[in-house]
Structure formats: structure tokens, C-alpha cells
Amino acid sequence: MDALAGLLDGPRAKGAFLLRMIMEPPWSVRVEDGAPLCLMCVTGGEAWVVPGTGAPVLLKPGDIAVVRGPEPYTVADAPGTPPRALAGPGGECTSLDGEPLDQSMRLGVRTWGNAPDGTATVLVGTYRMDGEVGRRLLDALPGLLHLPADTWHCPLMPFLEEEVSRDEPGQSAVLDRVLDLLLISAVRAWFSRPGAEAPAWYRAMGDPVVGRALRLLQNDPAHPWTVASLAAKTGVSRAALARRFTALVGEPPMAYLTGWRLALAADLLRGTDATVESVARQVGYSGAFALSAAFKRVRGLSPQEHRAGA
């Protein structure tokens, strides 16, 4: 599993909140749902995203924005339009006075707004994210990522708009997967921009030697890797691999592997009921004692304390 695949297993959409918003000016929605990640696509008209800090961003048809939470932000027809609705946790929407608006502004299946024929249409998907594997990638993103339509092409956006209002068996799973793919496409396009400040390990994926070594480590962390075995797989000497890996990734191969294993272990400890012994073996440690020692050394707490939320 590479880091982009890890993103799918980190903030992966599992019953994510997905909504088509149809609005006619003036309109403004203050978002205070605490979601760690929100993806917005404009399919008609325009919308402004006004973050808590930083400049407002105008979204036009075909544009996509990814907002990293949990800080509040506003989506509106214009930056200066006062909020008329408040979006809280779980997609609950109220007036500023606390009056529920979910039913009064409901326009159909997963469709909400102030006018059925409004000029602005925005697809909104919010994620729950508990995984550290995905967070390793998301932490490299800006608070507000904006991809204009003329800088990338993704055929998934029209498909998502078509599917969002359907109410058929398995539809939630379909929408979750499409949302996942749209997010991955956006992140990949963002990091591929000229001059993009992608994480070092992401840039290193393009190197024929280090990229192969990274994929080997990520795809099979339980293997008893050594610098020598990695070097043999990549066709270079141990010294050459260690030097090249450290220069491109920013840390030696075994240090990177330790961080990757512990991130995987942290997710398994929080997301499953597997024993510490089982988790240890899944991520490449000989047993619970070895994992506990590494966890304590690197993170300052035991696996049990991490699982308990310490």
C-alpha cells in the first residue's frame, strides 16, 4: 500500500456526508462541523470559499476545493454575504438562531438549498479521518487547496453529480468510492503542479531506485527488510541506496520503515480489536514486546495507551 492508497484507508469515505447544494444569491453557509476534510466541486454558477485565515477563493464550474478542518469556514455567493445558515456536525443545518433547516430547505435526495432552480450548484463531501497513514499525506496539504478547471481534468465530477441524487440499493457505497477517487485525483494533481511543494517521500516516488524501495517498504512492511535486502531488490549497493534514499526522502531507509510501521500500527490499534501481538506481527515486529519498545521510544507512550486515547 503506497501513501496515496493509504489516503484511501485513512480518511476513507465510509458513509461520508455527501450533499448537492443548489442556491440562489444571496446565500452564505457557515460550516462548523469539525470535519477534518471537506471536498467541494462547483458544477454550476460560482461559489466563494472563505477560510478562517487566508484569502477567499472563488470556485467556478469544474473547479474543486479541498478544505482541511477542523477550523470553521464559510461557503457563499460572495465573501461579504453574512451567513444565513450554520452547518454543524453530521450535516445538521440550522439557522443562526438554531432553527432546524434540514427539512425546510430539502430539495430532494441528498439535495438541499434555497431554490430548486438556483444558479449555483455545489457538491459537498465531508470525511471522518482517524487514520495516521492518511494524515501523513493530508498534513502536507494547505488548509485550502484549489484546483481550477483549466489546470486539471477529472471525468468523475459529472458522474458524481449524476449519482448523488439517486436513491438505489448500494448507492451510499457507490458514492463513497467515487468521492474517494475524486479526492485522490485532486491530491495527485495538486502535487504534480509545477513548483508544487510535495512531501519529500512523494517526490522520491519518481526516482527509479528510491521509488522502488519506497514501494517495497510500503507494500510489505511486515517483511524483515534490511538495507542490504532493499539494495538487492533495487539493483544498487547498500551504500548507494542509503545515500540516495536519505538525500531524497530526508531520512535513512530503516528510519522511514519504522515510521511507516508505527503509523500502520497506530491505525490498527485504534481501528480494530486486534491484540497488540497481532498488530505487531502485521506490521513487521516479532511480537508485542518489540512493538511496545518501538512505540514507546518513538511516540513516548505504549500501544495500550495509544489505543485508549492517551
What are these regions (language model features)?
Residues 39, 161, 214, 263-266:
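Hydrophobic residues on short alpha-helical segments
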Residues 42, 217-220, 268-269:
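Short helix-to-turn junction characteristic of helix-turn-helix DNA-binding domains
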Residues 117:
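Glycine-rich phosphate/pyrophosphate-binding loop
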Residues 181, 185-191, 212-263, 278-309:
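Basic/polar phosphate-binding segments, predominantly the helix-turn-helix DNA-binding elements
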